[in-house]
């Protein structure tokens, strides 16, 4: 179910503060965050945000097409290594 429009998008306050600070001083270093649940706002465009995937921080460069999506969508938590090959098919 989608979030109500009257509530607005959810963004952690500490992330907004870090983004505003980075924009003010024009800092290009990645902003490290564990907040995968935060919605990407237009203020984030052009910044690199390092999103935690459970093991490490994955750098995500924010573009205008990402606005409205969650940060966690761009930092995958699972690695798919493929299904095991069928030994009978190889022979």
Swiss-Prot record:
Keywords: Ribonucleoprotein, Ribosomal protein, RNA-binding, rRNA-binding. Pfam families: Ribosomal_S19. GO terms for molecular function: rRNA binding; structural constituent of ribosome. GO terms for cellular component: cytoplasm; small ribosomal subunit. Signal peptide: none annotated. Disulfide bonds: none annotated. The keyword ATP-binding does not apply. InterPro entries: Ribosomal_uS19, Ribosomal_uS19_bac-type, Ribosomal_uS19_CS, Ribosomal_uS19_SF. One of its GO terms (biological process) is ribosomal small subunit assembly. It comes from the Bacteria. Protein S19 forms a complex with S13 that binds strongly to the 16S ribosomal RNA. Belongs to the universal ribosomal protein uS19 family. This is Small ribosomal subunit protein uS19. It comes from Methylibium petroleiphilum (strain ATCC BAA-1232 / LMG 22953 / PM1).
């Amino acid at each position: 179910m989608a979030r109500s429009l009257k509530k607005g998008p959810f963004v952690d306050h500490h992330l907004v503060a870090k983004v505003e600070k980075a924009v003010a001083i024009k800092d290009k270093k990645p902003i490290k965050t564990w907040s995968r649940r935060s919605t990407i706002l237009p203020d984030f465009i052009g910044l690199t945000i390092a999103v935690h995937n459970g093991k490490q921080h994955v750098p995500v460069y924010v573009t205008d097409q990402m606005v409205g999506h969650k940060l966690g969508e761009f930092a995958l938590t699972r690695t798919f290594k493929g299904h095991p090959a069928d030994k009978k098919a190889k022979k």
